[in-house]
Amino acid sequence: MTRIFLIGYMGAGKTTLGKAFAREMSLNFIDLDWFIEERFHKTVQQLFLERGEDGFRELERKMLHEVAEFEDVVVSTGGGTPCFFDNMEYMNDCGDTVFLDVEPAVLFRRLRVAKQQRPLLANKSDEELMDFICEALQKRHPFYSKAKHLFKADELEDKRQIQASVDSLRKKLNK
């Protein structure tokens, strides 16, 4: 039975690497945000607005506990998931946790391209975006660093890099 939780900041590649890794290993893939959206028929943004951060984080925690019961699965968590309640410890108890560590400049490049799709980032200038990323990483690093495995995920820009990362992650996890 395999349970792998991918954690890291938005734009770290949790979904990109998670899907590719799950496919390679014949595992199921779950994006926790998508799982929540499917269950409640609302976007994460809508749930956040309706319930506030505390209400959303409690809901997220319940959904994390639900998906942690699944077997043979790779779970891509929300960027903030490890930072609330006992979520990080819970994931460590339930399976392997992998922190996808990405340099701030790489996150900036990835998020700058997709910032209109991310409400938190949509109206930020380049300077504000970089500051936002650095501040968030500083706050979240103590939680992310509790992962059982650290994996550098700076190179996920094309199929070759993604496959190389999948191969490296397999070796790291002895799979």
Curated annotation (Swiss-Prot):
Signal peptide bounds: none
The organism of origin for this protein: Phocaeicola vulgatus (strain ATCC 8482 / DSM 1447 / JCM 5826 / CCUG 4940 / NBRC 14291 / NCTC 11154) (Bacteroides vulgatus)
Catalytically driven reaction(s): shikimate + ATP = 3-phosphoshikimate + ADP + H(+)
Gene Ontology molecular function terms on file: ATP binding; magnesium ion binding; shikimate kinase activity
Chain positions recorded as Mg(2+) binding sites: 15
Binding-site residues, substrate: 33, 57, 79, 140
Biological pathway: Metabolic intermediate biosynthesis; chorismate biosynthesis; chorismate from D-erythrose 4-phosphate and phosphoenolpyruvate: step 5/7
Family matches, as Pfam families: SKI
Identification of the protein by name: Shikimate kinase
Cofactor note: Binds 1 Mg(2+) ion per subunit.
Record's subcellular location: Cytoplasm
Main location group: cytoplasm
Gene: aroK
GO cellular component, one term: cytosol
